[in-house]
């Protein structure tokens, strides 16, 4: 996936990397096979395991709970047990979807969890599974994107070229977070954790600032026009979440408070526009 790809770059200077995914033939990277991924850990005997695999099809998860549970929780538990036996570190990614998305205040790590959907429920179970390994770093993130593969900006650009009028949701709040940023922060955190094991725990990790999908789309269109891209869209309507009914409920408030992460790892998280503008430069230049 997008984060896994960036991790291969960011983690390279830390040591020898064994990258495993669903299609791997040398080791099992198929998270629908908990025994297989557990065996991979036993065979590789890593010092650090970074798990960027997940069932992220939020709406699909509503109708395939067992499969989502297998990928997001059962296999995580299998890996965590092997990691604990090895004395290895386990780095795992979670989501703001573990919360109910209410209010306007950024969520802190120890706020009450109450997932709105199956995806959130299985990811919460995954956090609890990852914590079976004492040396764990769990990073809750949100609105993840990358220049590589599909993303919201590319979808907006495609629609913006085809349609004169568009409607975009304006009552969900969060911070688009680049896979690059996640991977780089993960590498820093691993370095710190290896020297200071007491930093083990749960952290919120997203870019700084807040936006809505509507404002995010407006930035995409402004940058595209500035780059000379011809867009058909002349009217963009701000609409509520209720205008786009989906099988899975979406949170209104995806803001995460990253104070703990920034203090612990002595890092400053850039504003969300920094990474998004960089990604746009990359995709518009192609």
Question: PLM features: what roles do these ranges have?
Answer:
Residues 128-188:
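NAD(P)-dependent short-chain dehydrogenase/reductase
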Residues 49, 63-91:
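NAD(P)-cofactor binding segment of oxidoreductase domains
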Residues 31-71:
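NAD(P)H-binding glycine-rich loop region in Rossmannoid oxidoreductase-like domains
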Residues 20-35:
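Rossmann-fold cofactor-recognition segment
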Residues 185-186, 192-247:
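Mid/C-terminal beta-alpha module of Rossmann-like enzyme folds, strongest
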């Amino acid at each position: 996936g997008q984060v896994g790809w960036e991790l291969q770059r960011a983690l390279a200077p830390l040591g020898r990397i064994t990258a495993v995914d669903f299609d791997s033939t040398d080791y099992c990277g198929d998270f629908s096979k908990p025994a297989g991924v557990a065996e991979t850990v036993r065979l590789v005997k890593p010092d650090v395991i970074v798990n960027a695999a997940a069932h992220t099809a939020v709406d699909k998860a509503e109708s395939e709970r067992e499969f989502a549970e297998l990928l997001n929780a059962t296999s995580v538990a299998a890996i965590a047990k092997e990691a604990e036996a090895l004395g290895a570190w386990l780095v795992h990614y979670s989501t703001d979807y573990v919360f109910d998305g209410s209010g306007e205040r950024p969520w802190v790590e120890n706020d009450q969890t109450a997932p709105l959907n199956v995806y959130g429920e299985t990811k919460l179970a995954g956090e609890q599974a990852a914590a079976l390994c004492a040396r764990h770093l769990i990073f809750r993130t949100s609105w993840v994107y990358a220049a590589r593969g599909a993303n919201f900006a590319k979808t907006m650009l495609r629609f913006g070229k085809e349609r004169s009028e568009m409607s975009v949701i304006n009552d969900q709040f969060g911070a688009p977070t680049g896979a690059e940023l996640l991977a780089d922060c993960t590498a820093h955190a691993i370095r710190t954790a290896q020297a200071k094991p007491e930093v083990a725990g749960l952290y919120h990790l997203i870019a700084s600032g807040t936006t809505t999908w509507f404002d995010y789309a407006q930035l995409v269109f402004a940058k595209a026009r500035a780059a000379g891209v011809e867009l058909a869209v002349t009217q963009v309507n701000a609409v509520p979440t209720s205008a786009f009914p989906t099988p899975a409920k979406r949170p209104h408030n995806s803001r995460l408070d990253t104070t703990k992460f920034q203090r612990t790892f002595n890092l400053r998280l850039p504003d969300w526009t920094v990474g998004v503008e960089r990604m746009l430069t990359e995709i518009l230049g192609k």
